[in-house]
């Protein structure tokens, strides 16, 4: 696999190595050994995933921007196995030089790209195809009492979701998240969330 660093430290794009022939293709979607060998040195620590999730959504669905509060913080490794999504990570670590900045990447069933979102980031995606199946690995279990979010529709984040407003489809919960300017982040750049 090939690791691509982004403009925000720790946020990574992972390009798997595909083997193609007349029958189709094959690739390892995840190898703990290779992730440890190639990603951990860039991050400066290991990431041990413990839960896999999958969602299916239709065009215009926007999920996010979600995170889990300490001590239940999560890193995520995400990919789109059917359709197309725009996936976004937003830095919400107080004191970070990239606080409020984001990285956006299009994940598709054809490009097979994976996106690593570290702890201390809010995560969300928008479905750009008729339907999309989205998978993600987490390094902490889901804890509903630690749920948090910032508004996926916050214009100050400068995210072009590629979805016309009239087609945006959000859950009731996601419509109630705060704007970044009103948000008191539980994350701090000086606190190591991986210890």
What do the PLM-derived regions correspond to, one by one?
Residues 107-131:
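Conserved metal-binding segment of the jelly-roll/cupin
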Residues 1-110, 131, 138-195:
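Non-catalytic, conserved peripheral segments adjacent to functional cores
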């Amino acid at each position: 696999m090939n690791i691509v660093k982004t403009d925000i430290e720790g946020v990574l794009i992972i390009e798997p190595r595909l083997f193609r022939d007349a029958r189709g293709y094959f690739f390892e979607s995840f190898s703990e050994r290779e992730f440890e060998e190639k990603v951990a040195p860039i991050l400066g620590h290991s990431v041990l995933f413990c839960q896999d999730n999958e969602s299916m959504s239709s065009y215009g669905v926007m999920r996010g921007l979600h995170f889990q509060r300490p001590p239940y913080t999560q890193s995520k490794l995400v990919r789109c196995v059917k359709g197309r999504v725009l996936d976004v990570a937003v830095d919400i670590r107080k004191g970070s030089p990239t606080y409020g900045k984001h990285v956006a990447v299009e994940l598709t069933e054809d490009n097979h790209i994976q996106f690593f979102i570290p702890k201390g980031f809010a995560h969300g995606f928008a479905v750009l195809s008729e339907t999309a199946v989205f998978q993600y690995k987490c390094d902490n279990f889901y804890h509903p009492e630690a749920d948090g979010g910032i508004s996926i529709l916050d214009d100050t984040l400068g995210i072009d979701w590629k979805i016309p407003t009239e087609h945006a489809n959000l859950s009731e919960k996601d419509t109630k998240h705060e704007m970044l300017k009103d948000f008191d982040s539980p994350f701090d750049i000086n606190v190591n969330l991986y210890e």
